Amino acid sequence: MSEGDSNKTHFGYKTVEADKKADLVASVFHSVAAKYDIMNDVMSFGIHRFWKRFTIETAAARPGMKVLDLAGGTGDLTAKFSHLVGERGQVVLADINDSMLKVGRTKLRDKGIVNNVSYVQANAEALPFPDNHFDIITIAFGLRNVTDKDAALRSMLRVLKPGGKLLVLEFSKPQHEMMRKAYDLYSFKILPKMGEIITKDADSYEYLAESIRMHPDQDTLKEMMQTAGFEQVDYTNMTDGIVALHKGYKF
């Protein structure tokens, strides 16, 4: 099923009306928002911090830059970017889900991160920002939840400055058969049980496992970014490709 040319799309393994997916995804994140950070640590054994640190290092944000942390959720990347861009810079934490935004805003304010961060509820497919506005855009573990990924990539390209870079951190396809088998066992047997114990919501973590399997693999996403207009697109696999960081530029 191709992106953007059908009235149907995937919600995990289910086929749903395209205009219903956003609401279904929203219900997932409304349910898990309060325990989102805890679950990230538990289900990744803390490795998500390494993946995000590598993303920050690759972004190479400098003082005075404008950064969009799209699908930024509870603000892990925003907190780091806020320090790097300094008082002359700006970080926008954007998320389509208001529950996630509230958790992120509260967490960052409790850490004293207030002066150079703003919060916007936004749909990645139609970003409410001017053309050529941001130096860096990141979207971490969010693209797979977007209904029309092609439209979202084009929207990101539009608001990125010439010379700017997009970083897409997302679950992807393990490179070795033994890892794939172990990952499938973990994802479909263990992860939902963790979700039930910690968040009282196994279904949302079943969706997580399914949505990862339905997301474009490394080379397909690279092609999608190139088709959207990004240049010098490449990717780095982490943890045998369980996660990949894609990078592309606007020239």
UniProtKB/Swiss-Prot annotation:
Its pathway, per UniProt, is: Quinol/quinone metabolism; menaquinone biosynthesis; menaquinol from 1,4-dihydroxy-2-naphthoate: step 2/2; Cofactor biosynthesis; ubiquinone biosynthesis
Gene Ontology terms: biological process = aerobic respiration; menaquinone biosynthetic process; methylation
UniProt catalytic activity: a 2-demethylmenaquinol + S-adenosyl-L-methionine = a menaquinol + S-adenosyl-L-homocysteine + H(+); a 2-methoxy-6-(all-trans-polyprenyl)benzene-1,4-diol + S-adenosyl-L-methionine = a 5-methoxy-2-methyl-3-(all-trans-polyprenyl)benzene-1,4-diol + S-adenosyl-L-homocysteine + H(+)
- Residues noted as binding S-adenosyl-L-methionine in the record, renumbered to the chain: T74, D95, N123, A124
Keywords annotated in UniProt:
Menaquinone biosynthesis, Methyltransferase, S-adenosyl-L-methionine, Transferase, Ubiquinone biosynthesis
Domain of life from the UniProt record: Bacteria
Enzyme Commission numbers on file = 2.1.1.163, 2.1.1.201
Example of a GO MF term:
2-methoxy-6-polyprenyl-1,4-benzoquinol methyltransferase activity
Question: Top EC class per UniProt?
Answer: transferase
Similarity comment: Belongs to the class I-like SAM-binding methyltransferase superfamily. MenG/UbiE family.
Role of this protein: Methyltransferase required for the conversion of demethylmenaquinol (DMKH2) to menaquinol (MKH2) and the conversion of 2-polyprenyl-6-methoxy-1,4-benzoquinol (DDMQH2) to 2-polyprenyl-3-methyl-6-methoxy-1,4-benzoquinol (DMQH2).
By what name is this protein known? Ubiquinone/menaquinone biosynthesis C-methyltransferase UbiE
Which species is the source of this protein? Shewanella denitrificans (strain OS217 / ATCC BAA-1090 / DSM 15013)
- Organismal lineage: Bacteria, Pseudomonadati, Pseudomonadota, Gammaproteobacteria, Alteromonadales
